[in-house]
C-alpha cells in the first residue's frame, strides 16, 4: 500500500516537473547543445575508442603467487588446528557464538555490560564518587533490563531481535565472570581504557557471529572513529575473517589475476621499509599497506555473493551520506578553517571537512563513494530505492562542492566519465551536455574556484609547482628504489632539497610514490591499475549486471587517482585503507563471477 502511494506521488511530481517552464526551457537548450555535440569529432573519436575496447577479447590470466602459496598453507594449517581441537574451550566458545541468534548475543552482551557497570558502580562508590556511581548504577540497570527482556522474550526488544535458542546457566555465568574481570581492570587502566576494553569485547563477540558486521563496522570506523581505533577495528576484522575461513567445513583457495602484483608490491613495501632513510617512520605505512594486502588475500577466500556486496555498497553510501550531512551543517554554520586551507585572495570563507583532517581528504573520501551511487541507480529497478539513493547522492555531492577541493572536483568528473564510458557510451553522450548546462547554474564562488585550476596566481598552485620541481630532483638522485616507504621518508630527505618549506609530501601521488618506492614501485602500482581495468572490462562483457558494481568500485579508484595528480591521496591512513578495500572488493566480485560461471559450465557439461 505504502509503495503504491509513493509511486503515484513520485509519478505526479515527475509529470508536474516535465510540464513546468523551467524544465521546458533547459530541455530546449539541452536538445540544441546535444545536436552540435553529437556531430563533433570528439564524439566520433569516443565511438572509435569504445569499438576498439569492446571488440578486444582480453581474458585476465591467473597464477598462484608465493604469497598465495604461503597463505594457503597457513589457512589449511589453521583449519586442521580447528578440526583437531574442536573440544577446546576457546574454539567451542567461537563455534557457539557463531551458532547463536542475534537476540541471544545481544542479551548476553547486555548481561556482560550490566555486570561491568555494576562493578564500576561499587568501585567508584568506595572512592566517594557518588554522582558517577549513581549514573553507572542506572546504566547497569538499563543493560540488565536489556538482558532480562531478551532472555524472557518480553517487552519491545524481542520484536527486533528474535531469540529462538535458550540461554543456559553456563553461558550466563561465563558472561557475568567476563564482566567482573573487565571491571577488575578499572583501577589499573582507568575508566576510559577499561570501558574501551569492555566495548571492544562486546564488539568482538558480536562480529564473530557474522563477518559482514565486522566489515560494516570497519566502513563505519573509517568515517567516524579516530585513526588508532579504525586500525584496531581493521585488524579485528582480519582476525574474524581468519576465524571464519578456519571454521569452514570445506575450503578451496581462490586465485585471482592480481595475486602476483600484490605479492610484488608487498615485497617492495617490505624492502623499502627495511632500507628506508627513516625506518621507524616507514613502519606506519608498512602496517597499513601490508595489512591491507593481507586483507585482500583473505577477503577473496570468503563465501560471498553479489547480494552481500550490494549491502556493503548501500552501507558505504549511507555512511558517506551521514558525513555529507555533517559537511552541509558545517557549511551552514560556517565552521572555522585553518589558514593554510585556502588562498587569502580567493574569497572563500568556509571549506567543509566533516570528520576528516582537512577538506581535501574529505573530498578524496567522497569521490570514491559517488560512482557506487551510479552503479546502484543503474542496477535498481524500484523507483523508491532510486529516489533514496538520489537523495543520499545529492547530499554527498553538495558536500563535495562545499569542500572547494579542485582536485576532488576533477576526480569526481573523471570517475563519472569513466563509469559511463565503460558502461554505455550513449549515456555518457547524454550526460556531458547536462553536466555542462549544470555548470552554468553553480554559484559564482564555485565557478571562480574552478577557474583557478592551473593558475599560478593561486598561492597553493604556485607552492605545489615548487614542491613538484624539488620532488623530481629527488627522483633523479634515487630513481629506481626510492628513499623509503611513507611520508616520513619524504620529509626527511626533502629537507636537503627544500629549505624554504617543510612539506609533508609531494602534493602529487605519482611523484610521491616515485620518491618513496622508486620508479620500479610506481610501475607496479600502475600495472595493478591496468590489471584491475582488464578484470572490470572482462566481467562487464561476461556479466554486465554484476560488473556494474565492480565498475562502481573501479571508477571510485580512478576518481581518487585523478585527484592524486594534485594531491598525495595515499597519505591519510583512512584513505589508504579505503583504497585497498576497493581493490579487495573488485578482486572478490571477479572471484564470485568466475566461480558462478565455472559452476554453470559444469552443470551444462553434466
What function would you assign to each model-found segment?
Residues 353-354, 358-360, 397-402, 406, ...:
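A conserved mid-to-late transmembrane alpha helix and its immediate loop/hinge
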Residues 107-148, 170-189, 196-206, 263-273, ...:
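Alpha-helical transmembrane segments of multi-pass inner-membrane proteins
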Residues 392, 508, 537-566, 582, ...:
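Loop-to-helix entry and N-terminal half of a specific, functionally important transmembrane alpha helix
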Residues 1-271, 277-281, 304-314, 379-387, ...:
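Transmembrane signal-anchor hairpin modules in multi-pass inner-membrane enzymes, especially those
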Residues 276-300:
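Alpha-helical transmembrane segments and their immediate interhelical/interface regions
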Residues 341, 446-448, 454-469, 473, ...:
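Long extracytoplasmic/lumenal interhelical loops at the membrane interface
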Residues 130-136, 189-193, 227-232, 284-285, ...:
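Membrane-interface micro-motifs in multi-pass membrane enzymes
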Residues 203-209, 237-244, 294-301, 372-379, ...:
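Transmembrane alpha-helices and membrane-interface helical segments
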